[in-house]
Amino acid sequence: MDIGCYPITTSRFIFGEEPTRVVGLIENDPDFKTDRLASAILDFPSGPATFTCSTQMVHYQRMQIFGTKGRIEIEIPFNAPLDKETRIFIDDGRDVHGSGIVTETIPLTNQYTIQGDVFSRAVLGLGDVPVSIEDGIANMAVIEAVFRSANSGAWERP
């Protein structure tokens, strides 16, 4: 799973817990034999998370987090372009017209350079690793369960 790892990681981070089961659909590219379109439902003890991602559809990237009193939308959250600021829209949910939306802007940055710098500092003993090996293993268990579900057509446990 290519970009599906990002919404899975983010969902686990937001909920602060692991999903108990997942169901997924995956379409593979017939030439490259890689996943090109994936959708999944992750069933967490606190509620569901859903995502759809693709490597071969129109360029569009958003993450939306819905709560009972509002929502947050992040524009281009996972590979922000080097020439465009990232915007976060915070909606207090006062109406369906979005009159309660406040926009926060994150300045231009190179996420991959920062990631490389943080990793290098950790390797040199100058900082902590921001994500543990255990977290990576837990994320991989969810990804593998989505693949199993796509093959079985049933809910699977990570």
What are these regions (language model features)?
Residues 1-27, 41-47:
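Oxidoreductase and adenylate-handling cofactor-binding alpha/beta cores
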Residues 2, 22, 65-68, 123-124, ...:
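Short glycine/serine/threonine-biased micro-segments
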Residues 5-9, 113-117, 137-141:
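A structural signal for well-ordered alpha-helical segments within the folded catalytic domains
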Residues 14-17, 68-72, 146-149:
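Phosphate/oxyanion-binding loops and surfaces in catalytic or ligand/nucleic-acid-binding neighborhoods
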Residues 28-35, 44-115, 132:
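NAD(P)-dinucleotide binding in Rossmann-like oxidoreductases
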Residues 38-40, 127:
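Glycine/small-residue-rich pyrophosphate-binding loop that anchors the diphosphate of NDP-sugar donors
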Residues 104, 118-158:
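C-terminal helix-rich "cap/oligomerization" subdomain common to oxidoreductases
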